[in-house]
């Protein structure tokens, strides 16, 4: 079980999430190896190694009585179909760790796969969402493999890193520097970046949590990237939307993440990118 799983597991089983301001924003985590940098419709093999040598994030069993039962969140409806399908080729790179991999769910049920399916059903017929994550990865590992991930030539990147840094107590300045480096390199490649956030709990110590909570909104403001404040909003802590490990979402949990958390931020970005690409080809 990874440090991420160990540290988060305890707090996910508490009866409520303790917020302090927006305590502990960290970036989302994604998971298939970049060797799996293929559109989500392709088969991928999992790996648990990265350049920073993280431990694998494996589910651990907890009893249902230990899991948090929350009121069922209101699920946004699917996207409305476009009047005219958009055939402009669009590549979206989802990069992070195990939550993007979809640990514990079928390949077609992870968030990149569901996101691609929803976009195509709505009329974005030539969109591909690439699942490029690494379980247990730190922000240093992500930066070290970024050139590999960029071979997919993404138009849009959903960037989610930093959770495993927090679990290891990596200095906040290191995490900040790595995320900024990743954003700079992604933007330099021509990719529009969406920064995904995650909340951590006070078991890491108030001082660290408070410092960590300032990283992501500050970076989003400084760089002007689109921003998802809490990637698992409405899902974290809900026993009905998480697997027995109380960490990784179920298929239904990922549906909520896609419809309620990703699409409201992604769609304005996608519309702008499509318009820009269409005008450049005319």
What are these language model-derived features?
Residues 99-102, 106, 133-137, 164-166, ...:
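Short histidine/acidic/glycine/proline-rich micro-motifs that form metal-
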Residues 125, 141-282:
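Alpha-helical cap/lid subdomain in secreted, periplasmic
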Residues 1-93, 121-122, 152, 255, ...:
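N-terminal secretory targeting modules
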Residues 18, 138, 250:
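Residue-level signal for threonine
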Residues 33, 130, 194:
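Conserved Rossmann-like nucleotide-binding pocket used by diverse enzymes
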Residues 68-135, 145-153:
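Serine-esterase "nucleophile elbow" of acetyl-processing enzymes
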Residues 24, 35, 110-117, 138, ...:
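Secondary-structure junction/capping motif
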């Amino acid at each position: 079980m990874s440090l991420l799983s160990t540290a988060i597991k305890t707090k996910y089983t508490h009866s409520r999430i303790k917020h302090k301001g927006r305590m502990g924003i960290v970036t989302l985590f994604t998971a298939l190896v970049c060797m799996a940098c293929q559109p989500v419709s392709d088969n991928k093999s999992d790996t648990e190694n990265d350049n920073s040598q993280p431990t694998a994030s494996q589910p651990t069993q907890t009893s249902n009585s230990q899991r948090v039962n929350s009121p069922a969140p209101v699920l946004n409806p699917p996207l409305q179909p476009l009047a005219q399908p958009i055939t402009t080729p669009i590549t979206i790179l989802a990069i992070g760790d195990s939550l993007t991999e979809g640990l514990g769910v079928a390949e077609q049920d992870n968030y990149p796969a569901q996101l691609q399916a929803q976009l195509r059903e709505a009329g974005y017929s030539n969109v591909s969402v690439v699942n490029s994550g690494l379980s247990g990865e730190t922000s240093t590992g992500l930066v070290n493999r970024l050139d590999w991930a960029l071979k997919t030539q993404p138009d849009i990147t959903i960037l989610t890193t930093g959770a495993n840094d927090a679990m290891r107590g990596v200095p906040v300045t290191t995490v900040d520097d790595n995320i900024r480096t990743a954003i700079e390199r992604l933007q330099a490649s021509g990719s529009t970046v969406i920064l995904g956030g995650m909340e951590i709990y006070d078991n890491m110590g108030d001082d660290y949590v408070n410092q960590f909570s300032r990283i992501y909104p500050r970076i989003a403001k400084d760089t002007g990237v689109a921003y998802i404040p809490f990637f698992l909003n409405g899902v974290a802590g809900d026993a009905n939307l998480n697997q027995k490990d109380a960490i990784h979402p179920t298929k239904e949990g990922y549906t909520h993440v896609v419809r309620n958390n990703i699409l409201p931020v992604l769609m304005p970005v996608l519309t702008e990118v499509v318009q820009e690409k269409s005008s450049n080809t005319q």
